């Protein structure tokens, strides 16, 4: 149940953000709470990387379909 783990992690971060608990993740959350513009900057930085991965996957799928169209396995001597 991955959603249970994610929800538990969210709860831990919420607890860390409201208390004096220090960890790498808690510091990041506390910085985002202090300056919400950092959230937009972080999202903008990761968006182009995600788009290039999607484009690469589309290209790979196109190449796979082209190969499968050329040889459909009906030849007896190859």
From Swiss-Prot:
Keyword Nucleus: yes
Subunit structure: P0 forms a pentameric complex by interaction with dimers of P1 and P2.
Regions of compositional bias (Basic and acidic residues) in chain numbering: 51-64
Region (Disordered): 40-78
GO BP: cytoplasmic translation; ribosomal large subunit assembly
UniProt xrefs under PANTHER family: 60S ACIDIC RIBOSOMAL PROTEIN P0, LARGE RIBOSOMAL SUBUNIT PROTEIN UL10
GO terms for cellular component: cytoplasm; cytosolic large ribosomal subunit; nucleus
Keywords: Allergen, Cytoplasm, Nucleus, Ribonucleoprotein, Ribosomal protein
Record protein name field: Large ribosomal subunit protein uL10
Compositional bias (Low complexity): 40-50
Function: Ribosomal protein P0 is the functional equivalent of E.coli protein L10.
Family: Belongs to the universal ribosomal protein uL10 family.
Keyword Nucleus: yes
GO molecular function: large ribosomal subunit rRNA binding; structural constituent of ribosome
InterPro entries with a match to the protein in the record: Ribosomal_protein_uL10
UniProt-annotated location(s): Nucleus; Cytoplasm
Species name: Culicoides nubeculosus (Biting midge)
């Amino acid at each position: 149940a991955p959603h249970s783990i994610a929800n538990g992690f969210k709860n831990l971060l919420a607890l860390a953000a409201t208390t004096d608990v220090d960890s790498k993740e808690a510091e990041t959350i506390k910085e985002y709470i202090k300056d919400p513009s950092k959230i937009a900057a972080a999202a903008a930085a990761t968006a182009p990387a995600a788009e290039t991965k999607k484009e690469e996957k589309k290209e790979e799928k196109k190449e796979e379909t082209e190969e499968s169209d050329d040889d459909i396995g009906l030849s007896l001597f190859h």
